[in-house]
């Protein structure tokens, strides 16, 4: 429980920035699950996600070794000293499926599939781990910040917006932040 005095700085009704990151509403029926065998590491899925719940992550060997058991990784194309994973915050996802729709996949098979939220609840621990890792500036420099692939390795400043599922406006706002 919180005492009323904890809210004295917010008597005017303001809310601090970034608090949506703690909501974890779990409102989607189905959420994307990543299949690395079909991934070409284009990052289009992260690019179109209105809520920034799906993110590419470059991991050092040490970070990959310390990852929660079961987290899937690939060698990062073009930078073999890093591992690559596509991390999904299932509890922040709205289930719109934009990421799956845009995924080119490999050999006719997509790298993302929508699966039941309850069945994929374990995926949240991977996101919770990767979101705390530092941004790799050398990865952004290699893939260029002005490209779809490179831009998605940066932490978005507009995340978990709460907009309607599949909103077409928030990806643009997310991108310019």
Question: What is each PLM-predicted segment?
Answer:
Residues 1-93, 100-174:
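Ferredoxin-type iron-sulfur electron-transfer modules and their immediate structural context
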């Amino acid at each position: 429980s919180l005492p009323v005095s904890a809210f004295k700085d917010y008597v005017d009704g303001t809310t601090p920035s970034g608090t949506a990151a703690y909501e974890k509403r779990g409102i989607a029926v189905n959420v994307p699950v990543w299949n690395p065998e079909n991934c070409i590491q284009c990052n289009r899925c992260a690019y179109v996600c209105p809520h920034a719940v799906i993110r590419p992550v470059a991991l050092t060997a040490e970070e990959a070794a310390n990852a929660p058991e079961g987290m899937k990784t690939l060698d990062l194309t073009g930078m073999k000293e890093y591992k690559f994973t596509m991390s999904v915050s299932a509890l922040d996802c709205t289930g719109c499926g934009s990421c799956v729709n845009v995924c080119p996949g490999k050999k006719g098979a997509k790298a993302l599939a929508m699966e039941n939220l309850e069945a994929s609840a374990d995926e949240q621990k991977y996101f919770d781990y990767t979101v705390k890792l530092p941004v790799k500036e050398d990865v952004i420099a290699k893939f260029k910040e002005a490209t779809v692939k490179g831009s998605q390795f940066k932490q978005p400043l507009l995340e978990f917006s709460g907009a309607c599922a599949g909103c077409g406006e928030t990806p643009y706002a997310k991108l310019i932040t």
